[in-house]
Amino acid sequence: MAKVTKASTEEPFQKDFIEVLGAREHNLKDIDIRIPKNQLVVFTGVSGSGKSSLAFDTIYNEGQRRYMESFSAYARQFIGDMERPDVDKITGLSPVISIEQKTTNKNPRSTVGTVTEIYDFLRLLYARVAEAYSYNTGKKMVKFSEEEIVQNIFEKYDGKKISVLAPLIRGRKGHYRELFEDVRKKGYLKVRVDGEVMDLKPKMQVDRYKIHDIELVVDRLAVADDMKLRLSQSVQKTLQLGKDLMFLLIQDDGKLVQYSKQLMCEETGISYEEPSPNAFSFNSPYGACPTCRGLGNVYTIDIDTVLPDTSLSVNEGAIVPLGEERDASVFKQVEDFARKNKINLNKPVKELTAQQLNLILYGDKGINPALELDMSDESIPDFYTGSYEGIIPMLKRWFSSGNSSDMLRGWVEKFMVLSTCSTCNGTRLKKESLWFKIDKWNIADLGNLNLDNLAAWFDGLELRMSDKQNAIAKDILKEIRERLQFLLNVGLTYLSLNRPSKSLSGGESQRIRLATQIGSQLQGITYVLDEPSIGLHQRDNQRLIAALQHLRDIGNSVIVVEHDKDIMLASDYLVDIGPRAGKHGGEIVAKGPPENILHSNSETAQYLLGKKSIAVPKVRRKGNGKFIELKGVQGNNLQDIDVKFPLGKLILITGVSGSGKSTLINETLYPLLSKYCYNSKAVPLAYKSIKGLEHIDKVIEIDQSPIGRTPRSNPATYCGFFTEIRTLFASVPEAKIRGYKPGRFSFNVKSGRCDVCEGGGMRVIEMNFLPDVHVHCEKCNGKRYNRETLEIRYKGKSISDVLDMTVDEAVEFFQPVPFIYRKIKVLQDVGLGYITLGQSAVTLSGGEAQRVKLSTELGKKDTGKTFYILDEPTTGLHFQDIKHLLDVIDKLVDRGNTVLVIEHNMDVIKVADHIIDIGPEGGDGGGRILFEGQPEDLIKVKESFTAKYLQAEFK
C-alpha cells in the first residue's frame, strides 16, 4: 500500500501565532502578519488606517464565520452564510470573543447589577439569609412551626385556661350567614365576633354594612401536661382553618396572642410570604413595585406644558391639549361643562378661581351636568357617559389605555414628564421586599452604593451574621466578591448596581463586559477589544492594564485597538497600521515589542518619544469677560458646589472617573441652558441658582449617540449636502432630457431607487427567533438605485459612485462646486477623511458619530454666542488626529463662542484656556471643585490626580 506523504509546499501549523495572509478587507493592502498568541497585542494608527478592518472585520469576523460553520446544516439554514472576509488565509485562530464599545443596552430594566449578574446573587442572598422587619413598627417579624407554637404555649401559659381561635374573616363587610351555617354543621359551637365570644345558632348573621373580625373557637382547654396531645391536634387544625394563622385567647385577662407559620408582626398582625429570589427582582411581578412596575419612575402630567401661558383664555388656546379645533368633541364637552358651571372661557386663565380651573382640568364626576351633546356624533367615544371627565384624567386614560394607538400615546407623552415613583421612591421594589434586611441594610440600599463602598460593606460581613447565616451564605458571598473585584479592577469603582445600563458610556459598558469575561475564567480564547480606555482617567489606566494582562495570563490572546500611550507601552507586541487614513493607509508601518517600535520612523513612534507633540499655547485666550455662574449644585455626589464658566474660552472639565463631571455638565448645566435657549422639558438635577444665561443664545451638545438608527442614515444625509449633490445630478444634460428631478436621486423615493431593496442597498432577512441578517441586494448589488438612475453620470461618476467615495476623494472631486465642497471639507477637517459619504450610520463608532455632528455644526453660521458641550471628543483619535480636532475647536472659540469639553486626554487638557477640576476621588469621595483656572496653576494642586499626570506635559 502506498504511503501518503504531506505536500512539501504546506507549512507546518503554527501553534504560537495567529497568521493572517493576504488581508484586503476595506483599505487593507494585501497585508501579511503573524500575531503572537497568548500575549497582549495592541493595534494602533491614525483613525481610518485599517486597525478595525484587521482586528474586527478580518480576524473577528473569520472567527465568527468558522464558529457558524460548526453548526449543523439544519441550524445554518436559519442563519445563512456569513460573508468571508477578503483574506487569503488565517491560521492559528482560536474561538473569538469581541468586546466592542458601541453596543450598549437601551432596555430601561437593565442595570449594572443585572448585566454583571451580581444582583442575581444578591437576590439569592437576601432570599436565604435576610431577616424580615415589620413596615408598621420596624420590629423584627416572627414565625413559628407547629411544634414551636405548642412549646411556646406551655412555656408561657402553663396552668392557664385558653381558647384556641382560627381567624376566618379579618376586616371585611358582610352578613356571613352561610359561613356561620357551614361551621355550625361541622360541629363547632362558638365563634368570636368583633371581640365577643358567642354561641353558634341556626340562621345566625351579623350587620352586613359593618366591618367585622370573626374567629372560630376550635378548642377551649387548660394548659397541662396531660393536654399536650389535644393541644397539638387543636393547633394543627386551627392553623389549617386560619391559613397558617391562629389566635390564643387567655381567659384570665382576655389577652389575645397571635401565632403564625408565616412571617408576622406580633403587634399589628401583618404577615409576609416566605421570600424567594423573585421577591427581590424588579423584573418579576412578585417583587416589582405595583405602581411603576419595577421601572422606578412613572409618567406624570406636566401642568406647565398643559398650561404654558396663563395670560391666555381657554378659547385663546391656554390649554394646549385641546388643540385649535373649536368644534372638536372634547372642546364641546369643555364648553358645555363651563356653561353649566358659569365658567367664562374668554377670561384669562390666571383670572379664573382655583376651583374653576380645577374643575376644567380635573373634572367633577359628582356634578354630572348632563351635557347636551349630540351622541350620534361619531367623534365622541362610546364610553362617554355625559359626565365631564377633565383634561388631565382624560390624558392619563389615553396614555395608559391598551386601546390607545402608539400615535395617540406619543402625542400625550408631550404633556408628561418622567418622575420618580412616589410609591417605591425609585427603588423599583414593592414595600415588603424593602423590609428584608441584612445588617440593617435592605437590597435597594446596597444597590445604591458605589461599588467600592459595596465591596467594603461585604468585607467582614461574616462577623455581623450568625453562624447559621454564614453557613448558608458562604458560596453566594464568594461569587459576589469575585464579581465585584473584577469590576473594581477595571476602574468602575464609582458605579452602583442600580445604575441603568442605558446611562453608561461606550467605554463603561465595554469595561463591564471585560470584567464579566475575566470572571468567566475562560482559557484559549482570542479577545478583540475596541479602545477599553475610553472614559478612563490616567490614574485608573494601570488597573485596566492589569485586567488585560490577567486575561492574557490565564491563557488567552488579547488584541486591543487602542490609542492610549500607557496601554501601548504595556503591550507585549505593538502593531502600527498606516501611514495615514483611507486609501493612504492599510499597511503595516511597524510591528514588534514596544521598545522596537520606538526606533522606527512611524508617526506613532514620533509621538511616543516626544519628538512630535501638541504644543502648549504661548498665550491663552482671555475670553469676553462674561460668565455663567452656577451655585449650590447638589445632584448625585456633588457637594453643594459653586462654579463659574468663563465665556469665549475653551473650558476643560477634568477629574477621575465618577468624580461628578457628567453630573455637573450633562445633568445640570446642559438642561438649564437648553431650557433657557429652547424652552426644553429637560429637568436639571438639584441646584440653587444660575446667572449669566443672557450672554448666550444657543447651546449645542455634541455627544456620541448615533447619527441615525437605520442603515439608510449616513454622513451625506445627516450633514445635509446630499440634497445639493442630488440637485447637481439633476442638472446634468441627460437628466434634464429625461425629466429627472432631484428626488429621482434619493434612495427614499420610489422612482429612482432599486425596487427590490427599496434603496437600502441591503435586504433584511427576518430570522424569527434569531437576529435579522443583512445581505447585499442581488438586483442592484448594493448600489441602492435602479439602472436608469445609475446611467446619469457627473464627471463620469454615478450617484452610487459618489456615495461610495471617501471624504478625501469627495473633497477633490467636488472642489469646483463650492456649495458642496465647503460642507465636505469640514468632515475632512475633523479627521473623517477616510469614511465614505454613504457609510451606514450604524457602522460609525461613537467618536466618529460625534465628529460628524461637530462638522455639521461647524458648517453652520453662528452668532459668536453659542455654548458648545463636547463629551470626550478624542475617543478613537490618534495623536495626529487630536491635533486636527483641536484646530477645529480653536476655530469655534476664535469666533467668540464657548466650547466646554469633558476630557481625560492630557494633550487636550494642556491647551485649555480654563480648567475646572472635580474630585479628588470618584463617587462619594469626589464631588468637590479642586481647582478653577489655567493648566499651569493646576499642577500645583496636590490632591488633584489630574495635576499629577499633567505635570509631565510641562517639563
Regions found by a protein language model. Name each.
Residues 1-955:
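Conserved phosphate-binding elements of NTP-dependent enzyme cores
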